[in-house]
């Protein structure tokens, strides 16, 4: 598929991926999980909190904030290079949001088929928000002359299976790190309005509110499975997913730093602030989080980034050696000290 600068959006061939979506470890993915196990979630141990969260999601506070008639045409003319950077961000974001929609929708359907109507409707609310976000991103892409065929995209990319505990840990972090990404970009653009190149960014404030609520919903689900956050298992899952999500965020943000620079944001400092805030927020859900006081975890990001770039750019016999250095660094970061939290748990 090719992009166009005018006229109707270009269309994808049957086996084509959207532009700017090369297949690699940092590409957004589609997921599936243990739906039958999820349907056995014991809500009674969290009944009061669940009903309060259900009412909040049902209220759909951001319905009127997402105006489907609002223009998403870019405000500024961009150079071909900056246009490609902006489009790349939109494509990867729309795939990520649509992936969340599909997962939440499937969980909702499985709950309803299992007779768990409350839980089914609960996840319908989450799917509603993700679909709304994907719709706005899709509209923004169409103004750039790109039409991503979202319904057929999962047919071109195999879904990745995760156990339920993995899905809940990763979903919580995905929503909370998304919240901090959106809110920090929103705050920066409000302080620097000259950097707002498209009206899409005007929707980032309600957008981040949705992400924050979704994280709280997933936290509630985790609390209904006490075994996921107890003992050695809880510590290992906390360590693994915090490390994985933070590492992926660092590599993605800094590898695609041109987008943040387009907005006047230093990608390295942005990545650091997002990680600090997400780690702190995770104290409300995870039994353990990384200890940042000594600065080792954050400072190692720079060494890891440099090793990653060297490996990617290296050729010949030196490439395996560069990969070995990169792997040793990330494993060293993985084993850094953690601290116990006071996260509320049921059971």
From Swiss-Prot:
InterPro entries: AcsF, Ferritin-like_SF, Rr_diiron-bd_dom
Pathway the protein takes part in: Porphyrin-containing compound metabolism; chlorophyll biosynthesis (light-independent)
Pfam family, one: Rubrerythrin
Cofactor(s) needed for function: Fe cation
Reactions it catalyzes: Mg-protoporphyrin IX 13-monomethyl ester + 3 NADPH + 3 O2 + 2 H(+) = 3,8-divinyl protochlorophyllide a + 3 NADP(+) + 5 H2O
The keyword Oxidoreductase belongs to this UniProt entry's keyword annotation: yes
One example of a Gene Ontology biological process annotation: photosynthesis
Keyword Nucleotide-binding appears in the UniProt entry: no
A GO molecular-function descriptor: iron ion binding
Tree of life domain: Bacteria
SUPFAM superfamilies, per the entry: Ferritin-like
EC number: 1.14.13.81
Keywords: Chlorophyll biosynthesis, Iron, Metal-binding, NADP, Oxidoreductase, Photosynthesis
PANTHER family with a match to the protein in the record: MAGNESIUM-PROTOPORPHYRIN IX MONOMETHYL ESTER [OXIDATIVE] CYCLASE, CHLOROPLASTIC
Protein family: Belongs to the AcsF family.
Described purpose of this protein according to its UniProt entry: Catalyzes the formation of the isocyclic ring in chlorophyll biosynthesis. Mediates the cyclase reaction, which results in the formation of divinylprotochlorophyllide (Pchlide) characteristic of all chlorophylls from magnesium-protoporphyrin IX 13-monomethyl ester (MgPMME).
Protein's name in the database: Magnesium-protoporphyrin IX monomethyl ester [oxidative] cyclase
Organism encoding this protein: Prochlorococcus marinus (strain SARG / CCMP1375 / SS120)
């Amino acid at each position: 598929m090719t992009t166009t600068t005018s006229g109707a959006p270009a269309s994808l061939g049957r086996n084509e991926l959207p532009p700017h979506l090369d297949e690699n470890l940092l590409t957004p993915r589609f997921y599936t999980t243990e739906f039958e196990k999820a349907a056995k979630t014991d809500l009674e141990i969290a009944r009061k909190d669940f009903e309060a969260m259900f009412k909040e999601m049902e209220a759909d506070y951001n319905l009127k904030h997402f105006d489907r008639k609002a223009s998403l045409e870019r405000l500024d003319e961009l150079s071909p290079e900056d246009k490609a950077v902006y489009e790349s961000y939109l494509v990867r974001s729309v795939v990520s949001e649509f992936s969340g929609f599909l997962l939440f929708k499937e969980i909702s359907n499985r709950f309803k088929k299992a007779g768990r109507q409350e839980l089914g409707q609960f996840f319908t609310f989450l799917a509603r928000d993700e679909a709304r976000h994907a719709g706005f991103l899709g509209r923004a892409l169409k103004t750039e002359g790109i039409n991503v065929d979202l319904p057929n995209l999962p047919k071109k990319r195999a879904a990745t299976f995760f156990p339920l505990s993995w899905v809940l840990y990763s979903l919580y972090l995905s929503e909370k790190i998304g919240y901090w990404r959106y809110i920090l970009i929103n705050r920066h653009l409000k302080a620097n309005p000259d950097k707002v190149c498209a009206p899409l960014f005007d929707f980032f404030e309600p957008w981040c509110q949705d992400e924050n609520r979704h994280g709280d919903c997933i936290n509630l689900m985790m609390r209904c499975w006490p075994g996921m956050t107890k003992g050695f298992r809880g510590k290992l899952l906390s360590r693994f997913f915090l490390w994985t999500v933070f590492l992926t965020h660092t590599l993605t943000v800094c590898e695609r730093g041109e987008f943040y620079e387009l907005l006047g944001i230093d990608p390295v400092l942005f990545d650091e602030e997002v990680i600090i805030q997400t780690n702190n927020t995770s104290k409300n859900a995870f039994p353990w989080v990384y200890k940042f006081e000594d600065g080792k975890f954050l400072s190692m990001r720079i060494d890891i980034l440099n090793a990653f770039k060297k490996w990617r750019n290296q050729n010949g016999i030196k490439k395996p050696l560069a990969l070995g250095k990169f792997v040793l660094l990330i494993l060293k970061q993985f084993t850094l000290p953690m601290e116990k939290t006071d996260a509320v748990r049921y059971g």
